[in-house]
């Protein structure tokens, strides 16, 4: 799947490590401030517990990151769960793939 250009894409956040993919040089400072470290083709950050995960989700929403859709506990599914239980109260954006290079970005207010 080809990641959207000039976007921050959260590909994993339900496990013990959050993963963000981006080609935006301007995103580096924000990700470093959140504790992310650059790997070869992505940014990674350990997640201590669910409180840490909730704070990280809120911070990534503030950075206008895209949360990837998918099966099981996709980043978008986790944000929706946090909205249902009242942890996330703001809007966010998600991305769904329709093909290897086709995607749809949706705003959830």
Regions found by a protein language model. Name each.
Residues 1-109:
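Accessory DNA-engaging acidic/polar modules
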């Amino acid at each position: 799947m080809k990641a959207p250009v000039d976007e921050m894409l959260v590909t994993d956040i339900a496990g013990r490590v959050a993963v963000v993919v981006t080609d935006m040089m301007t995103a580096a400072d924000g990700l470093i401030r959140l504790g992310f470290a650059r790997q070869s083709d992505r940014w990674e950050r350990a997640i201590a517990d669910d409180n840490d995960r909730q704070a990280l989700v809120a911070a990534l929403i503030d950075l206008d990151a895209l949360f990837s859709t998918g099966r099981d506990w996709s980043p978008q599914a986790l944000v929706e769960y946090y909205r249902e239980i009242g942890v996330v109260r703001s809007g966010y954006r998600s991305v769904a793939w329709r093909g290897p290079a086709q995607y749809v970005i949706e705003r959830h207010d």
